[in-house]
């Protein structure tokens, strides 16, 4: 299965008649492996900050996490594995695998829990596959 197929079939899928606003699979260096059409362009310093938070959990908490210049308040995640952010009625979930970052961005009516489930399920699968 191609990376693009993972994005559309596993991340942009319908969940209780809702779906993510956008999603992507990125390399740890921020290189886009696959993305949905509306996915925002990360800036290099944003990827650096995200990777640092995976290495040093809590790094982004004081300043927030920025994605394409938009600020997200960092909320409870899983240290070293998952970063979650909230912005208004929406948010973001980022799951780190051995080689990739699985990213999902949502807005209401999708819930944070639905976004977490979709992103983390694919991330866990990729980890099992050695990715």
Curated annotation (Swiss-Prot):
Motif (Involved in PIP2 interaction): 81-97
One Pfam family this sequence matches: Profilin
GO CC annotation, single: cytoskeleton
Xref: InterPro entries: PFN, PFN_euk, PFN_sf
Entry annotated with the keyword Metal-binding: no
UniProt entry keywords in alphabetical sequence: Actin-binding, Allergen, Cytoplasm, Cytoskeleton, Disulfide bond, Phosphoprotein
SS bond list: 13-115
Domain of life: Eukaryota
Residue positions where Phosphothreonine is found in the record: 111
Keyword Phosphoprotein: yes
Compartments, record wording: Cytoplasm, Cytoskeleton
Signal peptide: none
Stored Gene3D superfamilies: Dynein light chain 2a, cytoplasmic
Molecular function per GO: actin monomer binding
Family as reported in the entry's similarity comment: Belongs to the profilin family.
Further facts: The variability of the residues taking part of IgE-binding epitopes might be responsible of the difference in cross-reactivity among olive pollen cultivars, and between distantly related pollen species, leading to a variable range of allergy reactions among atopic patients.
Chain's role: Binds to actin and affects the structure of the cytoskeleton. At high concentrations, profilin prevents the polymerization of actin, whereas it enhances it at low concentrations.
Subunit structure: Occurs in many kinds of cells as a complex with monomeric actin in a 1:1 ratio.
Protein name, as recorded: Profilin-3
């Amino acid at each position: 299965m191609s990376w693009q197929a993972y994005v559309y079939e596993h991340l942009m899928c319908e969940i209780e008649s809702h779906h993510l606003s956008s999603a992507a699979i990125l390399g740890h260096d921020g290189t886009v492996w696959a993305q949905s059409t509306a996915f925002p362009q990360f800036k290099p310093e944003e990827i650096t900050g995200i990777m640092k938070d995976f290495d040093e959990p809590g790094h982004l908490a004081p300043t927030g996490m920025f994605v394409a210049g938009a600020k997200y308040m960092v909320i409870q995640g899983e240290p070293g594995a998952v970063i979650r952010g909230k912005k208004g009625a929406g948010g973001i979930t980022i799951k780190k695998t051995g080689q990739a970052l699985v990213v999902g961005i949502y807005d209401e009516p999708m819930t944070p829990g639905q976004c977490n489930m979709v992103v983390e399920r694919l991330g866990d699968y990729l980890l099992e596959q050695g990715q």
